[in-house]
């Protein structure tokens, strides 16, 4: 179970690949090999108390699979940090645009798919438990607003039917049951991407409550350039807390510290018009944005806002080729400079 301490979390799922590719991190002014430090301890020394990792079933690039997750989990726990495990139930990114099944599950019928979700989830949690690195929380699926494990669990567009929702929820419940079979007191999060969209958030979670899905935490993504303003976020989070009486975590967020791209690297956020009003793309602007963002969560009624996770704050442009098959467009949305030096915004 997670502690009651406010979660200052970071998703650093790329760390394993960055380190193996020669990337390094520094908390001091001297960014040289002999001054490199373990990222986990830099984060911890600056107020971070929890780490999120994604897990893919059989990723082509070999990172974020079970074997590598077991290794990273040991490092997280050795550093004295809490651990959130993010099941994608895919061999690659699972998000609102893609929720493809693992290749090994493609030909299973629905009963077989449901069983596979249960057994895989149980096995992963049991293996983590057996090596003394039990997650403090798991999330069943990643940004599953449109469902997961398409097409059996797809619920957007023409797939938004009663039958499809029942199948989707059956798959989610199989994941929850698998996690609970391995650890009955394990906290479970259900994560969607609509941090500032109350009608969509309510439509989704109403379905889960109507079906009696047993979960502990509402998880939301919030990126201002895609989702809206901090006022929009505040309104949605406060209404969700009142409606469902569940703990809430904003489990993905980020903000730029510059709009200047490192040479040869495109950026997802590269224009002034993508910025939130009042927060320039500077280290100071990023710092102020994060302070105000955290304040929104801390002030959710009845203490229901229990924390946040910053998505890939350490995805520095240390290499051109990545196992995920696309470029790094995130290097100005980090809490480290392009060379791996800690920014002043990394203080919680």
Positions of the model-derived regions?
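Active-site beta-loop-alpha junctions enriched in small/polar residues
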Residues: 12-15, 56-58, 88-92, 140-145, ...
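Short, solvent-exposed beta-strand-terminating loops
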Residues: 12-21, 83-95, 248-264, 306, ...
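Boundary/entry segment of secreted carbohydrate-active catalytic domains
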Residues: 2-39
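Glycoside hydrolase catalytic-domain groove-lining segments
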Residues: 36-41, 166, 181-187, 198-276, ...
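Aromatic-rich peripheral "rim/lid" segments of glycoside hydrolase catalytic domains that contact
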Residues: 20, 27, 157-158, 235, ...
């Amino acid at each position: 179970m997670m502690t009651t301490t406010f979660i200052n979390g970071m998703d650093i799922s790329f760390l394993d690949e960055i380190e193996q590719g020669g990337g390094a991190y520094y908390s001091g002014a001297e960014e040289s090999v002999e001054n490199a430090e373990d990222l986990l301890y830099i984060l911890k020394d600056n107020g971070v108390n929890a780490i999120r990792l994604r897990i893919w079933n059989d990723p082509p690039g070999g990172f974020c699979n079970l074997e590598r997750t077991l290794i990273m989990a040991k490092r997280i726990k050795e550093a004295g940090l809490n651990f959130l495990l993010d099941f994608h139930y895919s061999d690659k990114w699972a998000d609102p645009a893609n929720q493809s099944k693992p290749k090994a599950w493609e030909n299973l019928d629905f009963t077989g798919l449901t069983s596979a979700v249960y057994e895989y989830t149980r096995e992963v949690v049991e293996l983590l438990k057996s090596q003394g690195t039990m997650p403090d929380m798991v999330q069943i699926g990643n940004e599953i607003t449109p469902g997961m494990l398409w097409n059996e669990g797809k619920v957007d567009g023409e797939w938004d039917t009663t039958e499809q929702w029942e199948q989707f929820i059956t798959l989610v419940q199989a994941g929850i049951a698998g996690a609970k079979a391995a650890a009955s007191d394990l906290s479970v999060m259900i994560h969607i991407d609509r941090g500032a969209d109350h009608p969509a958030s309510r439509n989704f979670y109403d379905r889960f409550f109507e079906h009696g899905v047993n979960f502990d935490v509402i998880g939301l993504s919030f990126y201002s350039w895609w989702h809206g303003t901090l006022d929009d976020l505040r309104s949605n989070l406060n209404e969700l807390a009142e409606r469902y009486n569940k703990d809430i975590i904003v489990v993905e967020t980020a903000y730029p510290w510059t709009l200047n791209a490192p040479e040869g690297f495109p950026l997802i956020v590269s224009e002034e018009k993508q910025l939130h009003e009042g927060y320039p793309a500077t280290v100071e602007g990023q710092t102020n944005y994060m302070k105000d963002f955290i304040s929104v969560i801390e002030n959710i009624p009845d203490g229901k806002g229990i924390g946040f996770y910053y998505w890939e704050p350490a995805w520095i442009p240390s290499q051109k080729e990545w196992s995920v098959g696309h470029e790094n467009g995130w290097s100005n949305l980090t809490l480290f400079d392009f060379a791996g030096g800690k920014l002043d915004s990394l203080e919680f």
